[in-house]
Each structure stands twice: as structure tokens, then as C-alpha cells.
Amino acid sequence: MKALRIVLAATALLSFVAAPLFAAEPGTWKLRAGVGTVAPESSNLTTDLGNDTLVIDVDDGTALTLSATYMITEHWAFDILAASPFSHDINARVIASVDPGFSPNSFKVAETKHLPPTFSFQYHFIPDGTIQPFVGLGLNWTTFFDTKIDPALAAGGITDLKLDDSFGIAAQLGADWMLNDNWLINVDVRWINIETDAALSGPAFAPATSVDIGTVAIDPWVYAINVGYSF
């Protein structure tokens, strides 16, 4: 009898230890808000400029981020990422063909803003743990707006920069740290395929109305830290 009580007590203890601490059941929502930084590739575009080479660089941008995750099953989820507009300076360098080793300081071409809504399916490895890591894969749509040419270029007759919308894949790696049944801290890293066709226009290109300068491969890493609520 004593041995039976010990076995039952041990079984109960093991059941308690193995019980889910913060189970993310199907139908659970996780809402997160925080700060994200978009870090584009350096040297996003290299194109010929007569006998020289033009190199375009896009600076980092930081903005508020929002995401909503819906648990379809204990492991599979659907995630939507939104954000306030990210702002970027677009700079250029001209590498002279007569001296390829010489590259002067970059000069500002324009500034622009973009919104990067992203839709992903996620797989959560430990949906009932205190730390809940996950991976995601999905699609991104990026739209550019409020693009402004630098006044120095505008004075020279280059008055507009057009950036087309972009559609591409997005990959994600992240984790939720469950503080209790509801509140959590989240960190995630995303790589997003963003490529946009760019064109300059203005009186400087007369009689042409615009000049295509190529495809700008932004392809940023996005780093974010968020506070979230699960219900």
C-alpha cells in the first residue's frame, strides 16, 4: 500500500511537471506591438553611368511595428505584420572608370517612405513552453510613397524618383517569452525580398521624360522587439 501511494504521488508529480504551462490552443490570438528596424543590403544597385559606375545605397529605417498571430492548431499559425511608415535616405556614389579604386563620399539622392505588410504561416515548436520559438514563411507587399528628391538634385533638373511596388517572399525566426498566461515579450528577425524598379525624371533628361536606372534590391533584414498579449 505504501509503495502504491508512492507511485501515485510520483505519477501526480510528473503529470504536474509535464503539464503545459502556457498552452497556445487552437483559436488563440497573440497581438504584439513594438519597434522594428529595417536594415537594407548595402550597395543595393550598381548600374552603368556612361563610362562610370553609379552605386545606390539605402539607409536603415526604424518604426513602430504591429503583428497579429492566430493559432490554427497548437503548432501552426497565421501571422500578419503591419507597421507605421519606415523612412529611408537614398544615397549614391559614383565610381570613376579611370580610377576604380577611388569612390568619393556618397551624396543624397532622395528620401522615401514605405509600408511593408507581410502575411506568413508560422510553425511553433514548443507551444506550451515559457519560451516558444517559431519560424515563418510568407509573402510581402511593399509600397513606396512620399518620395522626395534632394533639393540639390532638383536644382539641377532632376525632379522626381519613381519606385515601383514590390512583391516577394519573407522568412522569419522568432520567439515568445511568456511572462504569464497572457503577457509576453517577443523578438523576431525577418528577411524580406524587396526589389523595386527605379526611374528618375525631370528637365535634365529632355527630350526624354524619364530614365530607368535599374532594379534596386533592398532585401532587408528586419529586427524587432515587441510586447504582446495572448488570449
Task: Mark where each language-model region is.
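Gram-negative (and chloroplast) outer-membrane scaffold detector with strong preference
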Residues: 25-28, 37-39, 67-152, 218-231
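Short sequence motifs at beta-strands and strand-loop junctions characteristic
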Residues: 56-62, 109-116, 161-168, 215-220
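Extracellular loop and loop/strand-boundary signature of outer-membrane beta-barrel proteins
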Residues: 50-55, 102-110, 155-161, 209-215
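Surface-exposed strand-loop-strand hairpins of Gram-negative outer-membrane beta-barrel proteins
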Residues: 40-64, 157, 161-165
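Sec/Tat signal peptide C-region and signal peptidase I cleavage site
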Residues: 19-23
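Bacterial N-terminal signal peptides
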Residues: 8-17
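Predominantly the C-terminal beta-signal and adjacent terminal strand-loop region
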Residues: 87-91, 99-102, 180-231
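Outer-membrane beta-barrel translocator domains and adjoining extracellular loop/strand segments
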Residues: 43-50, 90-98, 145-156, 198-206
